[in-house]
UniProtKB/Swiss-Prot annotation:
Annotated coiled-coil segments of the chain: 49-71
Keyword annotations: Coiled coil, Magnesium, Metal-binding
Annotated protein name in UniProt: Haloacid dehalogenase-like hydrolase domain-containing protein 2
Organism: Rattus norvegicus (Rat)
Binding site for substrate: 13-15, 46-47, 179
Taxonomic placement: Eukaryota, Metazoa, Chordata, Craniata, Vertebrata
Cofactor note text: Binds 1 Mg(2+) ion per subunit.
GO CC aspect terms: cytoplasm
Gene field: Hdhd2
Family in the record: Belongs to the HAD-like hydrolase superfamily.
Length: 259
C-alpha cells in the first residue's frame, strides 16, 4: 500500500455498507462515531432511488446513525441538477417514495425519460411509453445503472438491466448521473475543499463504489457486506486499495494507517 498525503475526507456508501434495509451493519454506528472523532470530514453518497433524501435520513436516524441531511449526496440530487440544467420535462420512472426530491419539476408533456429503481413501474405499458418518447428523440437519463442490490430476502434486480433494455431497443445511450460516474464523486467532494487524492471511498459495490472512486484518484475500500460476492475484488483493475469484512474494519484501517 503506497504512502499517501494526509487524508481529509471519507465518502461512505449507505445501503449495503452502513445498513441493509432497516437493519444496521453490526458495529456501524459506533464505528461512525470513532471516524467522526478523527480529523477528517465524512460525507455519505448513495445511488438509492427508492426513497427521498428526507425518508432516507429518517431511516438512518431510526437506526441511531448520527447523520445530517447536508452530509448526504444522492443520485436523485444529481439527476434533479441535470434536469434543471437541461430544462427538460421528464417522464419520471422512479419509486413514488422518491418523488418528493423532484417537487416543482415540470412533468407535463414529457420530453425526457429519467429512470431509477422503480419495481412497481417496470411494466410493459410504462416501459413502452418511455420507449416511444426515446424514439421521438427524448434523452434518456439514468439515475444509475446498478445490476443488482441487496434486500433482506437476497439480491434483487437494479435499474441497470431496464436502462440497458431501453438503450438496446432505441439504439440510444443513457446519460448516467450516479455512481460510478466521475462527476458524481467530484460533486460529492465539492464542499470538502479537498482533492480526490486526499479522500477515500468505502462501499460494498466493487464497480460503482470502488472502481468509480479510484478512477478519479481516490482510495477505494471494498467491504464484504451488502451486495458483495466472493472474489468481487478481482473484477476491477486496479484492485481495491483494501478489501475488508465490514465498515467497522474499514474505519479501523483508516484510523490506524491513513490518519
Amino acid at each position: 500500500m503506497a504512502a499517501r498525503r494526509v487524508l481529509k475526507a471519507v465518502l461512505v456508501d449507505l445501503s449495503g455498507t452502513l445498513h441493509i434495509e432497516d437493519a444496521a451493519v453490526p458495529g456501524a454506528q459506533e464505528a461512525l462515531k470513532r471516524l467522526r472523532a478523527a480529523s477528517v470530514m465524512v460525507r455519505f453518497v448513495t445511488n438509492t432511488t427508492k426513497e427521498s433524501k428526507r425518508d432516507l435520513l429518517e431511516r438512518l436516524r431510526k437506526l441511531e446513525f448520527d447523520i445530517s441531511e447536508e452530509e448526504i449526496f444522492t443520485s436523485l440530487t444529481a439527476a434533479r441538477n441535470l434536469i434543471e440544467q437541461r430544462q427538460v420535462r421528464p417522464m419520471l420512472l422512479v419509486d413514488d417514495r422518491a418523488l418528493p426530491d423532484f417537487t416543482g419539476v415540470q412533468t407535463h408533456d414529457p420530453n425526457a425519460v429519467v429512470i431509477g429503481l422503480a419495481p412497481e413501474h417496470f411494466h410493459y405499458q410504462l416501459l413502452n411509453e418511455a420507449f416511444r418518447l426515446l424514439l421521438d428523440g427524448a434523452p434518456l437519463i439514468a439515475i444509475h445503472k446498478a445490476r443488482y442490490y441487496k434486500r433482506k430476502d437476497g439480491l434483487a434486480l437494479g435499474p441497470g438491466p431496464f436502462v440497458t433494455a431501453l438503450e438496446y431497443a432505441t439504439d440510444t445511450k443513457a446519460v448516467v448521473v450516479g455512481k460510478p460516474e466521475k462527476t458524481f464523486f467530484l460533486e460529492a467532494l465539492r464542499d470538502t475543499d479537498c482533492a480526490p487524492e486526499e479522500a477515500v471511498m468505502i462501499g460494498d459495490d466493487c464497480r460503482d463504489d470502488v472502481d468509480g472512486a479510484q478512477n478519479i484518484g481516490m482510495l477505494g475500500i471494498l467491504v464484504k457486506t451488502g451486495k458483495y460476492k466472493a472474489a468481487d475484488e478481482e473484477k476491477i483493475n486496479p484492485p481495491p486499495y483494501l478489501t475488508c469484512e465490514s465498515f467497522p474494519h474499514a474505519v479501523d484501517h483508516i484510523l490506524q494507517h491513513l490518519l
